[in-house]
C-alpha cells in the first residue's frame, strides 16, 4: 500500500509546537544533534548565564532565538555544537530580593539573622523560577543543555574563579587601594565602572544647586576695596560643601574680580570667577549701571569688573571654612591648580571635597590638602557621610574627636540626615532635601550667590535604581588598565554585529578603561581568596581548595585552628567529582572562619570582600568546565575555547562582553569569543520600555500558547535586524502566521492533495534539468540562488536577511508564481513526464525551504520536512535538525532565465496595479500592453516571456515601441533634495534643462543611467537616481513606470472582450460552487443557467470553454432555474444549477 502525504483539516501552529516537542523529547533529538556529530569539527558557543530569581520575559525569547538560530545552522552544516546552560546565582539582585522577602536590610544581617541563614535563603531564592525558565526554553525551542548547567555558586565553579584571580595576582594585576569609588548606599556596596555604565544608569535628574561664596582670608588689595571679597564656586551636590577643604582653578583660565551685590541679602561683595562665565552670572544689561544706585530687591544687579588674573595668580590664596561644622586640621582652605577645571559650566572654580570625588582626592593629595574626616567610636577615620548615605550622628563619633574638632551647636541640627531623600525610608521626593536645607542656611548667612534647580546627568545603582555616591573605599582592584592596549588590539579581531558596537560603544569603553573595582561588601557571592595578617605584613592568595586544605593543615599545626573543617567533612583533595565538592561550602561565613598562618607564624584572616558578580559570569568559559583542574587539554587545545559565537543584549556590552574579554586578555592573552551579536531592546509597539507596572509587558507563555513559537520567532527575527530595537506588536505575529506560514502551509497542502491523488512518492529518478519545462528550471534556479544567499546570510550572522529572503521566495516565487502558473499541470489526468517534473520540482522546493527555515522556525520546519520524507524516504534522519543544510548547485542556476522571469513578474505586477487603479478584474480580458523598450536586452527578456505575461495579465497582445517614437510621452522631474546640494547655484539652470529634455535624451538617460548637459560651456551630469521619470496617460490607456521599465495598458473594453470576461467570471463562480458543495476534484457536473440578455451571448459563444474548465458535461440555458444558486454581478444577477453526474 502506497504511503500518503499528511493532510490536515486545520492550520494550528500551537498544536504543531506541542506535537514536535513531544517528538523531540521522545526521540532525544537534541542529544542526537550532538552525538551524531561526534568527531566532526566543533563550533563553540557560550551561553551567558541568566538569573533564575526573576521570571523570563518576551525579550528573553528574542535573545535565545538568536543564539538558537546559529547553533542549529552550524549543526546542519556538519559541526558539533555543544551548548551548556548556565545560571548566574550570586550578587546584588539576589540579595536585594531576599532582603525584601524577609523584610530586612543589610544592617540586620549578622544581627537578627545569621550570615549562614541569610545565604541559605539566597541559595534557595536564586533558583526560584528555574522551572519557568526551563519551561520557556523548552516551549520556544531553544536547544541548550539544561540538565547539566554550570551554576556560579557551585564550589567547583568558585575554585576556577580563585585560580583565575591567582593568575592575576601572580602577574601583579591584583592590588588593594584606598580610593574614591562609585558606591551604592541603597545596596551597601561599591560598584565597578562597567556596572555604572549599564544602560539607564545615568539619567537626568533635577537637583538644587548653589553658587557658593567662599570668603577670602588674604585678598589682593584691589579685591578688598568694595564689600566682602569671595571666591565663587558652583556645585550640584550642596551636601558635600561641609566637607570642602580646597578650591581649584585652571592653569590656563582667565579670571576676573567683580564688584557687585548679593542678590539675596543686598550686601556689597567682590567676587572672583572665570572671565568666560561672567555673563552666565551677571546680566550684561546691568554693566552700565552704577553700583551706588542699587537698592535691595532691584531686578538688575549692577556689576563692575576691576581686575583680571590667570589661574596661577590665585594659587595659595586662603579662605574661611564655608560650613565650619568639623575642623579638618592644618593645610586646608587654599586655592590650588587642577588641569581638569573647565569653563563649560559653573564658575571656573571647583569646590574640592576630597572624600567625595576621585578628581578632588587626586588634586588635593598632590597639593597637600587634607580631606575632612571624622573619627568613629572604633577610632577609624571616616568621611562625614556613613555607608548608609547619612551624616554621622554625634553618638557614633569618638568623644575626644568631638571635643577637639566638632562644632556641636552647628553640626547637631544636620547630624543623622541622609544626603539624598532616596536613601531615607521615611522621606519622599516631595520632602525637603538636605541640599535645600543647606542652601537655605547659606542664603541666610550671605554664603549663597545663586540657588537654582538644575537638570544634570547623575549615576544610579543598576539594581536599586537609587543615586550613587562617590565614596572613599578600601577596595581590591584588577589593574585592567595595564592590559588596555592589548584589549583594544584583540577587540579588532572580533566580528561584531553590528560592527559599530565593536568600534563604538565597546571600543570607546576600552579606550577610556579604568581599573576594575573587584570588591563587594556583601554576603552572597564568591569570596575573595586573599588572607592577610593584621599588620598587612604578609598575604596569601589561594588558587585552589587543595591549596587551602594544605594551608589549613599548617594553621592547625600552628594552633590557630582546632581542626581542618574540610578534612572533618571527608573532603578529599584532588577528587573532582560533585559528591566530594558538595561536602564543603566555599561561601561566607564558613570561609571567614578559616584562619591561616603566615611565614613568620602570624595569624591571617580572609579579606572580608566578595568579588564582583560580573567576574563570575566573565569567567564562565573556564569555570563551566572546572578549568584547569579538569578538562585542561580541551581548553588548551582550543577545542572548547574561544567561542566561535556568543550573543546577548546590548546592555551586556559593558557587562558580560567586557568581563569575558578582560579576563581572557589578562589571563590567556586571547579573545574569548570570535563573533558576537549584540541584540537590541524589545520595546512595546509605541517604542516604550516594557514593564509590568505600565501594563505593556507581553507574556511569552501565553503568546506561544496562542500562536506557537515559530511565528513569534520569525516575527522577531525578520521584523528588524537583531541589533536594532524591536517595537513589539502582537498583530505582527498574526501577520507572519498568515502571510508566511499560512502560504507555506497552503503550498504544501496543494502538493499533498494532488500527490496523494496521483500516488507520487518520489521513487522515480530525478528528471534531468534539460528535460524539464522552462518554468521548472526557473524555480530550481531561483531556489539554488536562494540556498547560496541564505547560507551566506547565516554564515555572516545576518538572520533577518535570511528570513526575509525565504519569505520572499515562498510568497512571491513559489506560491504566487510557480504554483499558481502550474496548477493545471497537477490537475491534469494521467501521470506524464511533465506532471512528474512538476511534482519533483515542487517537492524539492518544499524540502529545501524546510531546511533553510529550520534554524529560525524549528517546529514547522520539522513538521514539513517529516511530512515530506516520511513518504519519500529520501533521508534517513528523524528530524530536519539532524539533516544536512542544502548545498548550492551552480549547474542548476540559469541567471538569464531568472532575469527573464523577473521581467515577467515586474511587468505583471505593474499591469495588475493599473487594472486595480480602474477596477478591472483580471478575468476581464484587455486588448494590448505597449512597452517602450530601453535596449535590446530588455526587449529580449520580455520577448522570452511574452506569452506568460499575456496569460498572467489577460491581454491579447504586447506591442514594443521605440522609446522616442512619441506614442508614449515621457517627462522628467528633478529631485531637489538630491540635486540641490549637488549643483547649488546652478540648480535653477539644471532644472530648466531637465524640464526641456527631449524624448531621445530621456531614452539615453534610461539606458545609460546618466545624462550630460551643456550649461553654457559647463558640463552638468545628472543620474537616473536624481530624477523621477514618468509617462503621461493617453486617452484609453494607463501608464506606469518603475526604473527602466515603462508599460502602457489599453483599458478600453470592447463587446468581444466583455463576452470573454463574462465567460471567465462564470467559470470562477462555478468552481467556487463545486468547492463549497464538497465535490471531488475529479467529479463531473451538469450545468443549467438562467437566461439573461447580459450573459446569453457570452454563454453561447464560450459554452465549450466553460464546460472544459469546470468539468461540465453540458451547459444549458433555461428561462427559469429552480433550486439554483444566485450569482450577483455589478448590475444584474442570474441563477445556476450544478448537479454532479
From Swiss-Prot:
A motif ('KMSKS' region) lies at residues 689-693. One of its GO terms (biological process) is isoleucyl-tRNA aminoacylation. SUPFAM superfamilies: Anticodon-binding domain of a subclass of class I aminoacyl-tRNA synthetases, Nucleotidylyl transferase, ValRS/IleRS/LeuRS editing domain. It holds the Pfam family DUF5915. A motif ('HIGH' region) lies at residues 50-60. IleRS has two distinct active sites: one for aminoacylation and one for editing. The misactivated valine is translocated from the active site to the editing site, which sterically excludes the correctly activated isoleucine. The single editing site contains two valyl binding pockets, one specific for each substrate (Val-AMP or Val-tRNA(Ile)). Monomer. This is Isoleucine--tRNA ligase. It comes from Bacteroides fragilis (strain ATCC 25285 / DSM 2151 / CCUG 4856 / JCM 11019 / LMG 10263 / NCTC 9343 / Onslow / VPI 2553 / EN-2).
Amino acid at each position: 500500500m502506497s504511503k500518503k502525504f499528511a493532510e490536515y483539516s486545520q492550520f494550528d501552529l500551537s498544536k504543531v509546537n506541542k506535537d514536535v516537542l513531544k517528538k523531540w523529547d521522545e526521540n532525544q533529538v537534541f542529544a542526537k544533534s550532538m552525538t551524531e556529530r561526534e568527531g566532526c569539527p566543533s563550533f563553540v558557543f557560550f551561553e551567558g548565564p541568566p538569573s533564575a530569581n526573576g521570571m523570563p520575559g518576551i525579550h528573553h525569547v528574542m535573545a535565545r532565538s538568536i543564539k538558537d538560530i546559529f547553533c542549529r545552522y552550524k549543526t546542519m552544516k556538519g559541526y558539533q555544537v555543544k551548548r551548556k546552560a548556565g545560571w548566574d546565582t550570586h550578587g546584588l539582585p539576589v540579595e536585594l530580593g531576599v532582603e525584601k522577602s524577609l523584610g530586612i536590610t543589610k544592617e540586620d544581617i549578622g544581627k537578627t539573622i545569621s550570615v549562614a541563614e541569610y545565604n541559605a535563603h539566597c541559595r534557595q531564592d536564586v533558583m526560584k523560577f528555574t522551572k519557568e525558565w526551563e519551561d520557556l526554553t523548552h516551549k520556544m525551542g531553544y536547544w541548550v543543555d539544561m540538565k547539566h548547567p554550570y551554576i556560579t555558586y557551585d564550589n567547583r565553579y568558585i575554585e576556577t574563579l580563585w585560580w583565575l584571580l591567582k593568575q592575576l595576582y601572580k602577574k601583579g594585576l591584583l592590588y588593594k587601594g584606598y580610593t574614591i569609588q562609585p558606591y551604592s548606599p541603597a545596596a551597601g556596596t561599591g560598584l565597578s565602572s562597567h556596572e555604572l555604565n549599564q544602560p539607564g544608569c545615568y539619567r537626568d535628574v533635577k537637583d538644587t544647586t548653589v553658587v557658593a561664596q567662599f570668603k577670602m582670608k588674604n585678598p589682593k588689595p584691589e579685591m578688598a576695596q568694595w564689600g566682602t571679597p569671595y571666591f565663587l564656586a558652583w556645585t550640584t551636590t550642596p551636601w558635600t560643601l561641609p566637607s570642602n577643604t580646597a578650591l581649584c582653578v585652571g592653569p590656563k583660565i582667565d579670571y576676573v574680580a567683580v564688584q557687585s551685590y548679593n542678590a539675596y541679602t543686598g550686601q556689597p561683595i567682590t567676587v572672583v570667577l572665570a572671565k568666560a562665565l561672567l555673563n552666565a552670572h551677571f546680566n550684561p544689561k546691568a554693566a552700565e549701571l552704577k553700583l551706588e544706585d542699587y537698592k535691595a530687591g532691584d531686578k538688575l544687579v549692577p556689576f563692575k569688573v576691576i581686575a583680571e588674573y590667570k589661574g596661577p595668580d590665585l594659587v595659595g590664596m586662603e579662605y574661611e571654612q564655608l560650613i565650619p561644622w568639623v575642623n579638618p586640621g592644618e593645610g586646608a582652605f587654599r586655592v590650588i591648580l587642577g588641569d581638569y577645571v573647565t569653563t563649560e559650566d559653573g564658575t571656573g572654580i571647583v569646590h574640592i571635597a576630597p572624600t567625595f570625588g576621585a578628581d578632588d582626592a587626586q588634586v588635593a593629595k598632590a597639593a597637600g590638602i587634607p580631606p575632612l574626616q571624622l573619627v568613629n567610636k572604633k577610632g577609624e577615620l571616616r568621611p562625614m557621610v556613613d555607608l548608609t548615605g547619612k551624616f554621622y550622628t554625634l553618638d557614633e563619633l569618638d568623644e575626644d574627636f568631638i571635643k577637639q574638632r566638632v562644632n556641636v551647636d552647628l553640626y547637631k541640627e544636620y547630624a543623622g540626615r541622609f544626603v539624598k531623600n532616596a536613601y531615607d525610608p521615611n522621606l519622599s521626593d516631595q520632602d525637603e532635601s538636605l541640599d535645600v536645607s543647606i542652601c537655605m542656611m547659606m542664603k541666610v548667612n550671605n554664603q549663597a550667590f545663586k540657588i537654582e534647580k538644575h537638570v544634570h546627568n547623575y549615576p544610579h545603582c543598576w539594581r536599586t535604581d537609587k543615586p550613587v555616591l562617590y565614596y572613599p573605599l578600601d577596595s581590591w582592584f584588577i589593574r585592567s588598565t595595564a592590559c588596555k592596549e592589548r584589549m583594544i588590539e584583540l577587540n579588532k579581531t572580533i566580528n561584531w554585529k553590528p560592527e559599530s558596537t565593536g568600534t563604538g560603544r565597546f571600543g570607546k569603553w576600552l579606550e577610556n578603561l579604568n581599573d576594575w573595582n573587584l570588591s563587594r561588601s556583601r554576603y552572597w557571592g564568591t569570596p575573595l581568596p586573599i588572607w592577610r595578617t593584621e599588620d598587612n605584613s604578609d598575604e596569601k592568595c589561594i588558587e585552589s581548595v587543595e591549596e587551602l586544605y594544605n594551608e589549613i593543615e599548617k594553621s592547625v599545626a600552628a594552633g590557630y585552628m582546632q581542626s581542618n573543617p574540610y578534612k572533618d567533612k571527608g573532603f578529599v583533595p584532588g577528587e573532582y567529582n560533585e559528591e566530594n565538592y558538595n561536602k564543603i561550602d566555599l561561601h561566607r561565613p564558613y570561609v571567614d572562619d578559616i584562619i591561616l598562618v603566615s611565614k613568620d607564624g602570624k595569624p591571617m584572616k580572609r579579606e572580608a570582600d566578595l568579588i564582583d558578580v560580573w567576574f563570575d559570569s566573565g569567567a564562565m568559559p573556564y569555570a563551566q568546565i572546572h578549568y584547569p583542574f579538569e578538562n585542561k587539554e580541551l581548553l588548551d587545545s582550543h577545542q572548547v575555547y574561544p567561542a566561535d559565537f556568543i550573543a546577548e543584549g546590548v546592555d551586556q556590552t559593558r557587562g558580560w562582553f567586557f568581563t569575558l574579554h578582560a579576563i581572557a586578555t589578562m589571563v590567556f592573552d586571547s579573545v574569548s569569543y570570535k563573533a558576537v551579536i549584540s541584540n537590541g531592546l524589545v520595546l512595546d509597539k509605541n517604542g516604550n520600555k516594557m514593564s509590568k507596572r505600565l501594563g505593556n509587558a507581553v507574556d511569552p507563555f501565553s503568546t506561544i500558547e496562542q500562536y506557537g513559537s515559530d511565528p513569534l520567532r520569525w516575527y522577531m527575527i525578520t521584523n528588524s535586524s537583531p541589533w536594532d530595537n524591536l517595537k513589539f506588536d502582537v498583530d505582527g505575529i498574526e501577520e507572519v502566521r498568515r502571510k508566511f506560514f499560512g502560504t507555506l502551509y497552503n503550498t504544501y497542502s496543494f502538493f499533498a492533495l494532488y500527490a496523494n491523488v496521483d500516488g507520487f512518492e518520489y521513487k522515480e529518478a530525478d528528471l534531468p534539468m534539460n528535460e524539464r519545462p522552462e518554468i521548472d528550471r526557473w524555480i530550481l534556479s531561483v531556489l539554488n540562488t536562494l540556498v547560496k544567499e541564505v547560507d551566506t546570510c547565516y554564515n555572516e550572522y545576518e538572520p533577518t536577511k535570511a528570513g526575509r529572503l525565504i519569505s520572499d521566495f515562498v510568497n512571491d516565487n513559489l506560491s504566487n508564481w510557480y504554483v499558481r502558473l502550474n496548477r493545471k499541470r497537477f490537475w491534469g489526468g494521467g501521470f506524464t513526464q511533465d506532471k512528474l517534473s512538476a511534482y519533483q520540482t515542487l517537492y524539492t522546493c518544499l524540502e529545501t525551504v524546510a531546511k533553510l527555515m529550520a534554524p529560525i522556525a524549528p517546529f514547522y520546519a520539522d513538521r514539513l520536512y517529516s511530512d515530506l520524507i516520511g513518504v519519500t524516504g529520501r533521508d534517513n534522519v528523524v528530524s530536519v535538525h539532524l539533516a544536512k543544510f542544502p548545498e548550492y548547485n551552480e549547474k542548476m542556476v540559469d541567471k538569464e532565465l531568472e532575469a527573464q522571469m523577473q521581467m515577467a513578474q515586474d511587468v505583471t505586477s505593474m499591469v495588475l496595479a493599473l487594472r486595480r487603479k480602474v477596477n478591472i478584474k483580471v478575468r476581464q480580458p484587455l486588448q494590448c500592453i505597449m512597452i517602450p523598450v530601453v535596449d535590446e536586452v530588455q526587449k529580449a527578456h520580455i520577448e522570452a516571456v511574452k506569452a506568460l505575461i499575456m496569460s498572467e495579465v489577460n491581454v491579447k497582445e504586447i506591442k514594443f515601441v521605440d522609446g522616442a517614437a512619441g506614442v508614449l510621452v515621457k517627462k522628467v522631474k528633478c529631485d531637489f533634495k538630491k540635486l540641490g546640494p549637488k549643483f547649488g547655484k546652478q540648480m535653477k539652470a539644471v532644472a530648466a534643462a531637465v524640464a526641456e529634455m527631449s524624448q531621445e535624451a530621456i531614452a539615453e538617460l534610461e539606458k545609460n543611467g546618466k545624462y550630460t548637459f551643456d550649461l553654457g560651456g559647463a558640463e552638468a551630469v545628472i543620474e537616473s537616481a536624481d530624477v523621477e521619470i514618468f509617462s503621461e496617460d493617453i486617452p484609453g490607456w494607463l501608464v506606469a513606470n518603475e526604473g527602466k521599465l515603462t508599460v502602457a495598458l489599453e483599458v478600453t473594453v470592447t463587446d468581444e472582450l466583455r463576452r470573454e470576461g463574462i465567460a471567465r467570471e462564470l467559470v470562477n463562480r462555478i468552481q467556487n460552487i463545486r468547492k463549497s458543495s464538497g465535490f471531488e476534484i475529479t467529479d463531473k457536473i451538469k450545468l443549467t443557467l438562467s437566461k439573461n440578455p447580459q450573459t446569453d451571448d457570452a454563454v453561447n459563444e464560450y459554452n465549450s470553454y466553460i464546460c472544459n474548465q469546470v468539468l461540465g458535461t453540458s451547459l444549458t440555458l433555461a428561462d427559469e432555474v429552480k433550486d439554483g444558486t444566485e450569482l450577483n454581478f455589478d448590475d444584474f444577477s442570474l441563477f445556476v444549477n450544478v448537479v454532479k453526474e
